[in-house]
C-alpha cells in the first residue's frame, strides 16, 4: 500500500519518541484539561535499540499508528496497518508532517524515495488504498481476520450486512470495525 511504512532520518540526539504526540498540539505540549486530549499512546515492543509506541486518536482509531525510534541512527519509523481507519490515516499524515515541521533538517523516506512531506492528496490515496483492500477481500467471499487496537475480529461472509454496492459495504465494515474497538473497551470498563 502507498506509504504504509515511512522513515524520518536525521533527528537530533535529544529526540524522544514519547514526546512526538506533543507536536500535534498548538503549544507543543499536552493540554492541561484532560477533555482536550485527543490522542494517546502506549509503549510497544520494538527491535533492539528502539523505543516504540502505538499512537491513536480517542474514539476514532481502529489500529493506531506504530512509531519506532532508533537511537543509533536517529531515525523514526512509522507503520500503518491495512485495517487503519480514516482517522488513523489522518493521524499518520499529521504526525509525519508535524515531526518534519519541528525538525526541518530531517528527511522523509518512503523506501528509497525522498518526500518533502505528505499532502492531502497522499492522504486521500492512502484512505482509498485501504478501502479497495477491504473491497478486494469482500469480493473473495472468504473470511478474513482484522487486527485492531484493542480487539481483532474474524469475519465470515455470513456476518456481513447486505449493502447496495461493494463500496458501501466496505466503507460500513471499516467504520464498524473502528467503532467496535471503542464500544467493547467501554463495556469492559463498565464491568470492572
Language model region names:
Residues 1-192:
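Acidic (Asp/Glu-rich) sequence patches and key acidic residues
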Amino acid at each position: 500500500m502507498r506509504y504504509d511504512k515511512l522513515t524520518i532520518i536525521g533527528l537530533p540526539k535529544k529526540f524522544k519518541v514519547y514526546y512526538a504526540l506533543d507536536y500535534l498540539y498548538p503549544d507543543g505540549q499536552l493540554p492541561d484539561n484532560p477533555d482536550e486530549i485527543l490522542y494517546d499512546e502506549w509503549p510497544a515492543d520494538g527491535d533492539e535499540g528502539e523505543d516504540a509506541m502505538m499512537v491513536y486518536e480517542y474514539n476514532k482509531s481502529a489500529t493506531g499508528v506504530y512509531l519506532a525510534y532508533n537511537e543509533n541512527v536517529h531515525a523514526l519509523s512509522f507503520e500503518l496497518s491495512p485495517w487503519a481507519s480514516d482517522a488513523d490515516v489522518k493521524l499518520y499524515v499529521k504526525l509525519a508532517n508535524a515531526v518534519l515541521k519541528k525538525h526541518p533538517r530531517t528527511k522523509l523516506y518512503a523506501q528509497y524515495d525522498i518526500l518533502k512531506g505528505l499532502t492531502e492528496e497522499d492522504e486521500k490515496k492512502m484512505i482509498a488504498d485501504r478501502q479497495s483492500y477491504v473491497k478486494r477481500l469482500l469480493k473473495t467471499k472468504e473470511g478474513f481476520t482484522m487486527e485492531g487496537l484493542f480487539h481483532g475480529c474474524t469475519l465470515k461472509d455470513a456476518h456481513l450486512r447486505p449493502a447496495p454496492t461493494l463500496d458501501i459495504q466496505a466503507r460500513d465494515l471499516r467504520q464498524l470495525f473502528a467503532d467496535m474497538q471503542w464500544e467493547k473497551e467501554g463495556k469492559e470498563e463498565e464491568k470492572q
